[in-house]
Amino acid sequence: ADPDRERWMGKKMTVDEAKAQAQIEKVGFIDTEKSVLNRIMTREDVYNVYFDTYRHDIDDLEDYNMMKAREFAQKYPGTRVKDCAPIIAEMRMQKDEDEVSLIREAIKLTDNGLKNLMAHLQPGQMEYQAQADFEYSIKRNGADGVSFPTIAGSGINGTMLHYVTNECECKDNTLLLLDLGAKYKGYCADITRTYPVNGKFTEKQRMVYEVVLAANRAVAKKAKPGMTLRELNDVCKKVLAEGCIRMGLIEKEEEIGKY
């Protein structure tokens, strides 16, 4: 341990503490990574090396793991570099009881955060204030933070899938779309909800809202083991299209993806 660094940054975990927490026998400091890896590669017959090269941030051209995979391939051209992201993704889809419990807690925190947001929502409030009401609640109640940058889009801003500036005023008779979630012990909630800024839907807003709600319920009813996300998405799109046709917003089902 570096006493100077610990004075500035706080106490660091020792190797023995890391072993006990991770339950992994061989643990070392990150600054020995290159020498350990080089020793293995020069003394052992290594044919395949796996990297998780999933791009976690939509704006990142290359994240840390992708950079490390590229550097490795250049340094050891005789070894095949393979992507283990699909394997890890499949493993992550299967949750044990402890994981489900943590996800439920993340959802509970998110639910309470939304209730706090709704209690303060009113015309004249800024989108970032609605965001702050949510994020204050989840942090105060034990969340690690947010699952992803909170989306709080009022009016036309709610039509943008990844609107994150959250800087406009929430006006009377408009809707506020929220895409948000709390993270708890590494597990994330992800919920989208839409509320009338003044607390009451207009007639047209209610009609559209009820079509979306019907699609949500239809997907929940149809969902079962073995179904693909594409199949569930098709269920959703059909209910949305039928509802929009009834309201006169579109004429044919295939138009649902145009707006």
Give residue ranges: language-model regions:
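Active-site neighborhoods and metal-handling regions in enzymes and metal-associated proteins
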Residues: 1-259
